[in-house]
Amino acid sequence: MIILDENFPESQRQLLKAWRIPIRQIGVEISRKGIQDEEIIPLLLRLRQPTFFTLDDDFYSRSLCHARYCLVCVDVAQYEAAAFVRRFLRHKDFDTEAKRRGTVIRLSHAGIFLWLLHSEKEVSLNWE
């Protein structure tokens, strides 16, 4: 299940829908508007295999790694967010929910940076 934070711009949400990427957005299809950051992790733990995309870099923390979800911080301009979500979901290392679970990821023009569950070092990957 792909979840967008409520801070994702409507234009980017519509692009993802136009590309037929099945998404649910906090405050639209799931939960409520105004949900606090500290309420998001408990919400994700109640959902089935969620991948959560946010523009909020506060979620890029090794301490947030958990086997039941994936957190993805999209660190690009707002108007590029949908393109980076699609690019990430097509990446061979992250193209299934099983491959994504247990990671906290930051997407940027420079590449993909991630924390893996039980890992002591940040990993970086190139876009392919």
Q: Can you say where each PLM-predicted feature lies in the sequence?
A:
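Acidic, PIN/NYN-like endoribonuclease modules and their adjacent C-terminal/linker elements
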Residues: 1-6, 10-20, 38, 60-128
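Histidine- and/or cysteine-centered catalytic micro-motif in compact active-site loops
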Residues: 7, 28, 56-58
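A short beta-strand-loop structural module common to alpha/beta enzyme folds
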Residues: 22-31
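Short beta->alpha connector loops at strand-helix junctions that form conserved
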Residues: 27, 55, 74-76
